[in-house]
A protein has these predicted regions:
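N-terminal membrane-anchoring/stem segments of glycan-assembly enzymes
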Residues: 1-37, 351, 377-380, 384-388
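Cell-envelope/extracellular polymer assembly enzymes that use nucleotide-activated donors
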Residues: 39-42, 72, 208, 223
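Long helical/loop segments within the catalytic core of UDP-sugar-dependent glycosyltransferases
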Residues: 101-102, 109-113, 117, 123-124, ...
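Catalytic donor-sugar/metal-binding loop of nucleotide-sugar-dependent glycosyltransferases
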Residues: 225-243
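Membrane-embedded multi-pass helical conduit in multi-pass membrane proteins
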Residues: 33-35, 294-390
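A conserved acidic beta->alpha catalytic loop
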Residues: 68, 77-86, 105-107
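Short, acidic, metal-binding catalytic loop of nucleotide-sugar glycosyltransferases
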Residues: 59-70
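Acidic helix N-cap motif at the loop->helix transition within catalytic regions
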Residues: 55, 82-90, 138
Length: 396
């Protein structure tokens, strides 16, 4: 029964995305044009030991095609141990719209530095930008275009991997590209689940009405999105407002990142379990439950697998009927093959939507992603559940 449940959930999610793509088109997804009168925007950049990196971020911000009299950049230093503050000060002397603030609440995490910056922000819109992320020239203009609709309370960007080189970075480049389209499709259902740290823009009233980023969360950009969904705040998503972000280049660094994401996600599911309800529309009856089921499904499969290893039993369910493979295909084989083909179709369609000169997504990379990434995800979840079981403290 377990393999049929896994197959059903996977098939449902894949078909859902394909149907959304069919509904809203594959050639182009229209995005609003920037307003004639641009709003004043505050960009908050939290930094900690980012010497040699934050300068590149500030250069990208300065190069943006956005009136500097409509812009303020607030860099919040979380008591860096290196020369990050001195590097930022060089920019504050040259550019009047850039200022440096020292965070007094150090040691709490990235969300604390963001909150400090937000308290000093004067903009009608507040953007949060990671210190290792580089927005394109037109990114901010494209994102502010969404706020011409008074019901829109936040907008997310098109996050891409910055200059991927080795295989680990290339795999993430494909993953990020697929996520871009997935998040856009979820916005049509009013079901965006995260406002990514690399670049997201909020109305200032979001923080006035709902409070600051949760300093107790290790995945604060997802927590704030859930909080917005809980209050029926609309989140839009752009597939052309590009921001490039540094991605882990080593497997252990990637592992630590994904453990934090997974454990933070589990806590957010638990915190907002009340939202598993018709009251919250597609987000409450489909997207949130499916995310939770996916995590629990991985846990059950892994638990069953390790149980068979310990007991020495033959686990036919986990192997998807491998023994019967030699005697003929069973139902599970057919369903598994269908899921694989639909997944391939989904990724190819997603590639078509966002493929451009910004980044090459060759079919070779896609094939490598399809082969290697499921194994990596399994490893990430094994490590996640092990840390949860032993109660290891998770820091940002």
């Amino acid at each position: 029964m377990l393999e049929f449940f896994v197959a059903f959930v996977t098939l449902f999610v894949t078909v859902l995305y394909l149907l959304l793509m069919y509904e809203y088109g594959t050639d182009s997804i229209d995005e609003p044009k920037p307003p004639n009168v641009l709003p004043f925007v505050s960009i908050v950049i939290p930094v900690y030991n980012e010497q040699g990196v934050v300068g590149t971020t500030l250069d990208a911000v300065i190069a943006m095609d956005y009136p500097k009299n409509k812009l303020e950049v607030i860099v919040v230093d979380d008591e860096s141990k290196d020369a990050t503050a001195k590097e930022v000060e060089q920019y504050t002397h040259k550019h009047h719209f850039i200022k440096l603030i020292k965070n007094k609440h150090v040691g709490i995490g990235n969300s604390s530095a963001k909150n400090t910056g937000i308290k000093h922000a004067k903009g009608d819109l507040i953007a949060t930008l990671d210190s290792d992320s580089y927005p394109s020239r037109d990114a901010l203009k494209k994102m502010t275009a969404y706020f011409q609709d008074p019901s829109v309370m936040a907008a997310t960007s098109e996050v891409r991997a910055y200059k991927p080189r080795n295989i680990i970075e290339q795999l993430q480049a494909v993953e990020y590209a697929v996520t871009i389209v997935s998040r856009k499709l979820l916005s049509f259902l009013d079901a965006v689940t995260v406002t990514p740290g690399p670049l997201s823009v909020y109305r200032a009233e979001v923080f006035k009405n709902l409070g600051d980023f949760d300093t107790g969360s290790i995945l604060e950009d997802q927590e704030i999105a859930y909080r917005m969904q809980a209050n029926n705040y609309k989140i839009e998503s752009s597939i052309s407002a590009t921001v490039y972000t540094q991605v882990p280049s080593k497997i252990m660094t990637l592992l630590r990142q994904r453990i934090r994401w997974n454990r933070g996600g589990i806590r957010n599911y638990i915190k907002y379990r009340r939202m598993f309800s018709l009251k919250y529309g597609d987000f409450g009856i489909a997207i949130l439950p499916l995310g939770f089921l996916g995590a629990m499904m991985v846990f059950v499969v892994l638990l069953s697998f390790f149980y068979t290893l310990i007991t020495g039993q033959y686990f036919e369910n986990y192997t998807y009927g491998l023994n019967s493979f030699f005697y003929g295909f069973g139902t599970v084989h057919v369903v598994s093959a269908l899921i694989f083909l639909l997944t391939v179709a989904w990724i190819i369609i997603a590639r078509k939507v966002i493929q451009n000169e910004k980044q090459d997504l060759s079919y070779v990379k896609i094939v490598a992603y399809l082969i290697a990434y499921p194994f990596l995800i399994t490893i990430f979840w094994i490590a996640t559940f092990l840390e949860e079981i032993i109660g290891k403290k998770q820091k940002w």
